């Protein structure tokens, strides 16, 4: 029996559910297991634990922002193929969200207290990008993923040598972020102008500075 198309109410409720899962810790079902080679939790000093927790909180916030961005773009995208691509990428990024939440819990820490704000701002940006054009929307994704990859690689370099667990998680995330970037470009993503790229980087830096502590 064929499934009936989703009504506007169904779509609204589904969107609300996705938003809540993005901002409420541990609300997503188990997805792929942690991409780690050992179940052993590395021993870190108090200072090291706090620093790694700050880095993972930034990365968790980045994944919350990715959820908001993809959901916003899917909400306003004009092309059905673009909508499906945004939704698929968002679903894959849920794994990253869960991995960061898990590592934060292992470190005895928590996500950013501003998580709902990060999501809301990103949803708005994504919705605007999706409304402008498909090429701009996909270009926005490509640039976002490129900048996310940069800070993931920077964080990997800042990890204590013995924290192989966090390193493997971030390395897997980085590989998949770059894949999402290539996918966006392959589907027609346009290069963004330098002022837009610089503004995105400035906003990301403000987010990282805040999320590291809060």
UniProtKB/Swiss-Prot annotation:
Catalyzes the hydroxylation of 2-nonaprenyl-3-methyl-6-methoxy-1,4-benzoquinol during ubiquinone biosynthesis. Belongs to the COQ7 family. This is 3-demethoxyubiquinol 3-hydroxylase. It comes from Psychrobacter arcticus (strain DSM 17307 / VKM B-2377 / 273-4). Fe cation 1 binds at residues 63, 93, 96, 177. Binds 2 iron ions per subunit. GO terms for molecular function: 3-demethoxyubiquinol 3-hydroxylase activity; metal ion binding. It catalyses: a 5-methoxy-2-methyl-3-(all-trans-polyprenyl)benzene-1,4-diol + AH2 + O2 = a 3-demethylubiquinol + A + H2O. Pathway: Cofactor biosynthesis; ubiquinone biosynthesis. Gene3D superfamilies: 1.20.1260.10. GO terms for cellular component: plasma membrane.
């Amino acid at each position: 029996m064929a499934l009936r198309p989703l009504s506007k109410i169904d779509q609204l409720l589904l969107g609300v559910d996705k938003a809540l899962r993005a901002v409420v810790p541990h609300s997503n079902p188990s997805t792929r297991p942690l991409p780690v080679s050992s179940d052993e939790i590395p021993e870190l000093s108090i200072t090291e634990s706090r620093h790694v927790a700050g880095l993972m909180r930034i990365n968790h916030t980045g994944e919350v922002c990715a959820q908001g961005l993809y959901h916003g773009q899917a909400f306003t995208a004009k092309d059905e193929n673009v909508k499906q691509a945004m939704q698929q990428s968002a679903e894959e990024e849920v794994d990253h969200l869960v991995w960061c939440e898990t590592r934060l819990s292992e470190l005895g820490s928590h996500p950013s207290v501003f998580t709902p704000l990060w999501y809301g701002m990103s949803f708005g940006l994504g919705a605007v990008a999706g409304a402008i054009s498909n090429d701009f929307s996909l270009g926005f994704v490509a640039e976002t993923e490129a900048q996310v990859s940069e800070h993931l690689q920077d964080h990997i370099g800042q990890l204590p040598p013995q924290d192989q667990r966090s390193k493997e998680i971030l390395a897997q995330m980085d590989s998949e972020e770059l894949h999402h970037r290539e996918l966006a470009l392959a589907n027609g993503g346009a290069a963004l102008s330098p002022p837009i790229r610089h503004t995105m980087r400035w906003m990301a830096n403000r987010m990282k500075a805040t999320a590291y502590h809060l």
